């Protein structure tokens, strides 16, 4: 058998660095495969040939979350998407993470990748999306831009999906115990309610509930796989959630005025091979 020098299963690997920060972004899904500070993982690291479980580190476009039965209506027309979460009968997290993105530019501290939506059943719209990862003194910055190349309006939404490292590197049943040593501050007034298939059903105020994380809160009342909205933005439009790891180090996740919600998943009951903590 002839040996072939194959690329990694996640495609080309784009390494960037700035000061004490280093990251690896992959061609597959524009995935942030690894992010470290002074050599220590800030996100759960993946190998270049590993199975990317739970959309770890990926960009969720043209829609995040779940669409019940794979059907949605946009401007009076109903579209049917392929079902890819069969136990809940939903379409989940879009298609950008399944594709190899095109490299646009690469510098020592930044990389830009691009993706064009294929003409597919259930989403015939023509989007061109760019994602720029850049490292600076204060960490990782991600800028995503979307362009509609079609002659009609296009439905579009975006989320990012990093799994933050809690510093204890636990698996399976260890995750809840380890997360209980961590805390979270999340500036949101409203919690999103869901049905048994995690389809949103409405909203409720967080006041007086375990979902009020506006003050630093230990993650002992688990599990969470929940969304929050009605965010408390600062005067400059920014909003930031703060995750304090078991070792006391703080990881800040935030954005500008375009950020409308946060999702928190604690990885409870995830099988060990998925390792999201």
Question: Predicted regions span which residues?
Answer:
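Beta-strand-rich N-terminal accessory domains
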Residues: 1-81, 239-259
């Amino acid at each position: 058998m002839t040996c072939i020098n194959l690329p990694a299963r996640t495609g080309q690997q784009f390494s960037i660095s700035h000061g004490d920060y280093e990251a690896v972004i992959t061609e597959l899904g524009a995935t942030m495969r690894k992010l470290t500070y002074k050599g220590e993982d800030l996100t759960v690291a993946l190998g270049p040939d590993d199975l990317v479980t739970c959309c770890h580190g990926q960009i969720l476009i043209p829609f995040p979350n779940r669409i019940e039965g794979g059907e949605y209506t946009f401007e009076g027309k109903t579209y049917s998407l392929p079902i890819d979460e069969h136990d809940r009968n939903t379409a989940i997290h879009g298609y950008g993470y399944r594709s190899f993105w095109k490299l646009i530019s690469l510098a020592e501290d930044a990389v830009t990748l691009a993706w064009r939506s294929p003409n597919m059943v259930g989403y015939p719209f023509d989007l061109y999306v760019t994602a720029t990862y850049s490292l600076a003194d204060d960490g990782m910055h991600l800028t995503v831009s979307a362009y509609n190349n079609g002659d009609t309006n296009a439905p579009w939404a975006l989320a990012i999906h990093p799994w933050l490292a809690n510093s204890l590197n636990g698996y399976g049943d260890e995750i809840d115990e380890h997360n209980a040593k961590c805390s979270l501050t999340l500036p949101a007034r409203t919690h999103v309610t869901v049905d048994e298939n995690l389809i949103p059903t409405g909203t409720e105020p967080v006041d007086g509930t375990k979902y009020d994380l506006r003050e630093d809160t230990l993650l002992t009342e688990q599990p969470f796989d929940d969304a929050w909205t009605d965010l408390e933005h600062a005067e400059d439009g920014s909003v930031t959630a703060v995750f304090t790891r078991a070792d006391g180090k703080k990881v800040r996740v935030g954005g500008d005025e375009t950020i409308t919600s946060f999702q928190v998943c604690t990885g409870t009951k995830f099988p060990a091979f998925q390792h999201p903590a």
